[in-house]
Amino acid sequence: FANKEMSNIVLSIDGRKEINDLMRPTRNGHGSSYDIIMPKFKKVAESRNQMNYYVRGTFTHNNLDFSKDVLHLADEGFEQISVEPVVAQPTDSYAIREEDIPYLCEQYDMLAKELVKRKKAGNGFNFFHFMIDLNGGPCVAKRLSGCGSGCEYLAVTPWGDFYPCHQFVGNEKFLMGNVDEGITRTDIREEFKNSNVY
């Protein structure tokens, strides 16, 4: 379904097994979500010839050494990787703190050096945060299309529901459909499609 209907797929995994399983426990609390999803995600990446997908993780205060998670995903064979900082309340134990920022900057520097080294050796990968235009910012097309929620991007829950973005999961006003019925609320897609920064 996803390969047929989606031009780009985002696969949620946080990196190393212990890091992923800490924030992404199984629904019944038993076993490892990492062990369940890793082989499936590898299959998706290969079915797309390592293009038009991202493995996307979140780093938190629990894994400030997130470069290890990025490199773990690369070592597992993924070539399109995005690992981003958590959005959390300051009181959450896993929230990024002000004092974490210098260490996080070091992690980005270490990651950049390792990425250059691997590209030169012929086993590079794309890291989403490094794929930016430092001079011009987002292109006009991206400014017109916005983030792509609801039209270029969908969050699919473990139970198969579609939302325009992971930020909306659980908010029934934004439930767009599911894997069995497809997109049933095209009005939500249209609303997001018509949103831009101009």
Q: Where do the language-model regions lie?
A:
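Radical SAM/AdoMet-radical enzyme domain recognition
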Residues: 1-86
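Short acidic, glycine/proline-enriched helix-loop-strand junctions
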Residues: 19, 26-38, 50-56, 60, ...
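C-terminal accessory region of radical SAM enzymes
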Residues: 103-136, 167-198
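Short, small/polar residue-rich loop motifs at catalytic or cofactor-binding pockets
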Residues: 147-150
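Short, acidic, Ser/Thr-enriched surface-loop or helix-capping motifs
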Residues: 157
